[in-house]
């Protein structure tokens, strides 16, 4: 029962996110850049032992 509710809420959030992305075509690019930069920062941090 709780799994069904959780799945339903996740679907609603995903639908809301997709609607926002349609409203702002550049919004998805910003998200990709943020993820990419965070991965690069993590890699450099591990590389230099910080």
UniProtKB/Swiss-Prot annotation:
The modification Phenylalanine amide is found at residue 48. The keyword Membrane applies. GO terms for cellular component: extracellular region; membrane; other organism cell membrane. Transmembrane segments: none annotated. Pfam families: FSAP_sig_propep. InterPro entries: Frog_antimicrobial_propeptide. It is found in: Secreted; Target cell membrane. One of its GO terms (biological process) is defense response to bacterium. Expressed by the skin glands. Its main location: secreted. Coiled coil: none annotated. Residues 11-35 form a propeptide. Amphipathic alpha-helical antimicrobial peptide with potent activity against some Gram-positive bacteria (MIC=4->80 uM), potent activity against fungi (MIC=10-20 uM), and no activity against Gram-negative bacteria. Does not display anti-leishmania activity. Does not show hemolytic activity (LC(50)>80 uM). Belongs to the frog skin active peptide (FSAP) family. Temporin subfamily. This is Temporin-SHc. It comes from Pelophylax saharicus (Sahara frog). The lineage of its organism: Eukaryota, Metazoa, Chordata, Craniata, Vertebrata.
